[in-house]
UniProtKB/Swiss-Prot annotation:
Keywords: Chloroplast, Membrane, Oxidoreductase, Plastid, Plastid inner membrane, Protein transport, Transport. The keyword Nucleotide-binding does not apply. NADP(+) binds at residues 36-42, 88-89, 115, 136. Expressed in leaves and roots. It comes from the Eukaryota. Disruption phenotype: Embryo lethal. GO terms for cellular component: chloroplast; chloroplast envelope; chloroplast inner membrane; cytosol; plasma membrane. Belongs to the short-chain dehydrogenases/reductases (SDR) family. This is Short-chain dehydrogenase TIC 32, chloroplastic. Gene3D superfamilies: NAD(P)-binding Rossmann-like Domain (3.40.50.720). The gene is TIC32. Residues 298-314 are annotated as: Interaction with calmodulin. Its main location: plastid.
Length: 322
């Protein structure tokens, strides 16, 4: 679909930009957290949300880089409301610190955009001794969402506006390990595959959004949760790629890769476009609903990932699982 740029049911395509899919949308009064907002499509996401009047909190590992991005955005969007806060998703302590500091500001939270990620890195463990891609791409966002969910619920009730949780997944979710999620081998270095581990983390992003949808509906809360594939974009997400592969991809990039404004489009569409009102538990691509791997519709697997993630995050805090 992206290669030909054909429009889907939404009226948008792989060639649509973040500005185009949010044209005419007024986000005044909304507050959003965007993780990984200091690089790649996270920057464009923060910029376009700001352009539409959203107060954006940039959750970034490097606050100096975040401050520079904020400065650049303000130059382009005078009057933009942006804050920079430190967040290292590979560290549960950092996630808890961020959530605590965010709640202490008293800010509402309408939109949570779980954008940050790493891709295809060599085998490494996080500060909590969990395989780094699983820890950063899935577990950090799982914990962040859990800690901020009450704030989102109260914001939705008080503002009478729909809250939206957006998980950036990838088409790589189709290429996880054969067993899908390696619950008993998350830290198995001997059989580690950098790309399959990435796919596993992206599969969990979709399953997380789907289980969230189920729980939010049961609670009767006006909050949606969706996942998406932003498209193939040449950003520093792939900084661990083999250099020869990077050169080969670069040679054909202009024919097959999205620009950053195009890459941020689906995120901004799912976060702001009124067409998505009330839509939850879906997987989007090119600003349209798409079909994910059938495995992600496995509700038992989604619950198992949820329980597994809860156990891992609770074990680092001394809490008991529930």
């Amino acid at each position: 679909m992206w290669f030909f740029g054909s429009k889907g049911a939404s009226g948008f395509s792989s060639r649509s930009t973040a500005e185009e899919v949010t044209h005419g949308v007024d986000g005044t009064g909304l507050t959003a957290i965007v993780t990984g907002a200091s690089s790649g499509i996270g920057v464009e996401t923060a910029r376009v949300l700001s352009l539409r009047g959203v107060h954006v909190v940039m959750a970034v590992r490097n606050t100096d880089s975040g401050a520079k991005v904020k400065e650049d955005i303000v130059k382009q969007v005078p009057g933009a409301k942006l804050d920079v806060m430190e967040l290292d998703l590979s560290s549960m302590q950092s996630v808890r610190k961020f959530a605590s500091e965010y709640k202490s500001t008293g800010l509402p939270l309408n939109l949570l955009i779980n954008n940050a990620g790493i891709m295809a890195c060599p085998f490494m463990l996080s500060k909590d001794n969990i395989e780094l891609q699983f820890a950063t791409n899935h577990l950090g966002h799982f914990l962040l969402t859990k800690l901020l969910l009450d704030t989102m619920k109260s914001t939705s009730r008080e503002s009478k506006r729909e809250g939206r949780i957006v998980n950036l997944s990838s088409e790589a979710h189709r290429f996880s390990y054969p067993e899908g999620v390696r619950f008993d081998k998350i830290n198995d270095k001997s059989s580690y595959s950098s790309m399959r581990a990435y796919g596993q983390s992206k599969l969990c992003n979709v399953l997380h959004a789907n289980e969230l949808t189920k729980q939010l509906k049961e609670d009767g809360v006006n909050i949606t949760a969706n996942s998406l594939h932003p498209g193939a974009i040449m950003t520093n997400l792939g900084r661990y790629f083999n250099p020869y592969l990077a050169v080969a991809v670069g040679a054909v990039a202009k024919y097959i890769l999205k620009s950053v404004p195009q890459g941020a489009a689906t995120t901004c569409y799912v976060a702001l476009n009124p067409q998505v009102a009330g839509v939850s538990g879906e997987y989007f691509q090119d600003s349209n609903i798409a079909k994910p791997l059938p495995l992600v519709k496995d509700t038992e697997l989604a619950k198992k990932v949820w329980d597994f993630s809860t156990k891992l995050t609770d074990s680092q805090s001394g809490e008991s699982s529930s």
